[in-house]
Design a protein with these regions (language model features):
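Exposed, low-complexity/repetitive linear segments and helix-based recognition motifs
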Residues: 2-8, 80, 117
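Signature of Gram-negative chaperone-usher
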Residues: 34-196
């Protein structure tokens, strides 16, 4: 009989302890929920890069066979530009050249032209802002015995042209029927200049 009473007493004590534990836990949850909100500051430091060519523009090679008629030869030239400045000031692609010569033979100083605007596309892996180009075409590549002052052949207006993008002009070389045969060479200079 005594053992049964003790067992019941122990059972009641266990229940009481569980009730007390539940109440204590509930109080802790209420205390945690009542804590005031905390604010913090997130910082992202973005360092400016530079304006330049991703890789040096490649050579442009024209080829034609004289056939007694005036000819126009077309050749494309991908130009990979990187504007990592983060400034949004825009940029200009300028060009100049020396006259095509083969010994004493020369082509016209207006032989090389662009009849339309170059194409422009973001490079793979670059979420770029395509350049807004304001150059009027056709464009004639400046040429002379000594390269004259460079002129703009393509540009990016303010807040455009950010990231890496490839500009592809389709150059046209005029070869009159009276052109003498030979291998003509010309030195071209392409430059990137900051500003709209």
């Amino acid at each position: 009989m005594m053992q049964a009473v003790e067992s019941r007493d122990r059972g009641r004590g266990s229940v009481r302890r569980r009730v007390i534990a539940v109440l204590a836990l509930t109080g802790a949850v209420l205390a945690w929920a009542a804590q005031p909100a905390s604010s913090l500051t997130g910082t992202a430091t973005i360092t400016a890069g530079s304006l330049g060519f991703v890789s040096a523009p490649g050579n442009v090679s024209f080829a034609a066979t004289l056939n007694g008629t005036d000819q126009t030869i077309t050749q494309t030239q991908p130009i990979d530009v990187s504007d990592a400045t983060g400034s949004g000031t825009g940029w200009n692609l300028t060009a100049t050249s020396t006259t095509f010569t083969a010994g004493a033979k020369t082509l016209s100083t207006s032989a090389t032209t662009l009849t339309g605007a170059p194409t422009d596309a973001c490079d793979a892996g670059s979420t770029c802002t395509l350049a807004t180009n304001a150059i009027t075409y056709p464009y004639t590549l400046p040429a002379g015995a000594t390269a004259p002052t460079a002129t703009k052949l393509f540009n990016a207006a303010a807040n455009t042209g950010l990231g890496n993008q490839t500009i592809t002009p389709s150059w046209k070389l005029s070869v009159p029927a009276s052109t003498q045969a030979g291998t003509y060479t010309s030195t071209w200079t392409l430059s990137l200049v900051s500003g709209p």
